[in-house]
């Protein structure tokens, strides 16, 4: 036997051993993996550390209290992005193949920029991309974006709810005519996402809209607020993030703009956004998809099984039950319920991203299930489908009393009759640009029902 032949046989044997080892690892693993593109340093650390802290603590709870999901333990690892797009993409590529044989369920980068940069990759890789309360609005249309899920609230629904509430405060939407509204937005894809829908509503209801950008990270806003003071708007919509939010509140107060006429969006609604502003933050208003507080059975279980066991993820225990932390818990519930739904169809085992995608698309969490989860009142009921990857769409308004958030409204729902055609048109344009043939959602639903 020649040396060349021996080398070829040796290489083939090596490849075979590697393949067998990989298959054995996958077979031996009884874990479901969540790669976490987290950020715990930098100007957005408060949001990242709170959110991922809540997400991780919920997964810990499911492992410690329930022995995982039907016996399948949850596992995860973090990759620090600092909210930088390039690092987020690097983290995705590094972690997407799973961990020690445990397959990847979904990614949750909590970053519009990172989400935009990985949409195409994750669609090809068949790994769900979860953008709770943010992301591309048109990814609501699952016929074009099968692997992207802007759960609970897309950016257009957020704006629609805010305009509806402002209209109610003005005596009706028709009373918005002649009003002045400013949107002060973070200079990023996230901040710019809602400009078109605000322009549409301004034209529809006759109010004057002015868009003012605050460059990243937002720690200097004097010129922007001086401009706002000159304009004398009736309302300011704050679409901030991280350090931009307390700076906005403090600068508004310095220039004499009333903080109770500033409405913070879904990423300008946390304790960390108002407490640094001190006493001048009292009266500030913001929207939320879920309240702060610990008076929920699921939070009490996390405290019992995770925190008191010394396995809590928060560096500062005082942040337990805050807006960012509770949103992480909400996100954990939605991710794990998707796994549970998918297991009911595909088996009680670790699942592929493609199988978990099916689980997300068939989520139907009603009040009964929320009560079973100990999360009734923590998050709104949510039902997803092939054509609707958002599912919720409602917000509540809250006001800072100087110490804590007080809910000041019931659920405010977006006008989907206005939004849906815009979403579908944008998704269709994207599909044409990318050469995507949209799924026939009606046919898929019919086929599913006929089985």
Segments the model singles out, each with a brief description of its role:
Residues 312-325, 336-410, 451:
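Segments of small-molecule ligand-sensing domains
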Residues 29-33, 46-53, 60, 64-142, ...:
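Beta-alpha junction/loop-to-helix N-cap segments that form part of ligand/metal-binding clefts
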Residues 81, 85, 103-116, 131-139, ...:
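Ligand-binding clamshell of periplasmic/extracellular solute-binding protein-like
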Residues 145, 252-332, 411-415, 426:
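Extracellular/periplasmic periplasmic-binding protein-like sensory domains
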Residues 81, 129-131, 136-140, 217, ...:
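Venus flytrap/periplasmic-binding-protein-like
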């Amino acid at each position: 036997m020649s040396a060349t032949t021996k080398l070829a046989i040796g290489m083939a044997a090596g490849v075979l051993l590697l393949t067998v080892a990989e298959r054995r690892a996958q077979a031996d693993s009884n874990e479901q993996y969540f790669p976490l593109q987290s950020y715990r340093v930098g100007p957005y650390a408060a949001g990242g550390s709170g959110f991922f802290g809540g997400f991780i603590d919920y997964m810990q709870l499911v492992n410690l209290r329930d022995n995982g999901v039907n016996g399948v333990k949850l596992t995860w690892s973090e990759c620090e992005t600092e909210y930088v797009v390039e690092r987020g993409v690097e983290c995705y590529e590094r972690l997407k193949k799973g961990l020690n044989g445990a397959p990847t369920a979904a990614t949750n980068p909590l970053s519009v920029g990172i989400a935009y940069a990985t949409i195409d990759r994750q669609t090809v890789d068949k790994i769900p991309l979860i953008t709770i309360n943010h992301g591309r609005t048109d990814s609501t249309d699952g016929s074009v974006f099968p692997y992207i899920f802007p759960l609970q609230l897309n950016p257009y629904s957020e704006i629609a709810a805010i305009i509806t509430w402002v209209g109610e405060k003005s005596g009706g939407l028709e009373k918005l005519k002649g009003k002045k509204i400013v949107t002060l937005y973070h200079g990023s894809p996230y901040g710019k996402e809602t400009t078109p829908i605000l322009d549409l509503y301004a034209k529809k209801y006759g109010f004057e809209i002015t868009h003012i950008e605050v460059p990243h990270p937002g720690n200097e806003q004097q010129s922007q607020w001086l401009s706002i003071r000159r304009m004398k708007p009736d309302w300011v919509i704050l679409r901030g993030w991280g350090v931009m939010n307390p700076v906005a509140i403090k600068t508004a107060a310095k220039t004499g703009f009333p903080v109770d006429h500033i409405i913070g969006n879904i990423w300008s609604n946390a304790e960390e956004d108002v407490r640094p502003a001190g006493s001048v933050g009292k009266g500030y208003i913001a929207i939320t998809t879920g309240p702060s507080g610990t008076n929920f059975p699921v939070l009490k279980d996390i405290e019992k099984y995770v925190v008191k066991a010394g396995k809590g993820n928060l560096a500062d225990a005082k942040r337990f039950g805050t807006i960012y932390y509770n949103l992480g818990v909400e996100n954990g519930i939605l991710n794990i319920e998707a796994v549970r739904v998918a297991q009911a169809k595909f088996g009680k085992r670790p699942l592929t991203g493609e199988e978990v995608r099916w689980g997300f698309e068939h989520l139907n969490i009603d009040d009964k299930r929320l009560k079973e989860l100990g999360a009734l009142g923590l998050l709104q009921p949510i039902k997803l489908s092939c054509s609707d990857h958002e599912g919720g769409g409602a917000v509540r308004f809250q006001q800072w009393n100087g110490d804590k958030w007080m809910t000041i409204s019931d659920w405010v729902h977006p006008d989907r009759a206005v939004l849906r055609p815009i979403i579908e048109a944008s998704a269709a344009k994207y599909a044409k640009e990318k050469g995507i043939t949209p799924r026939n959602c009606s046919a898929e639903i019919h086929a599913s029902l006929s089985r």
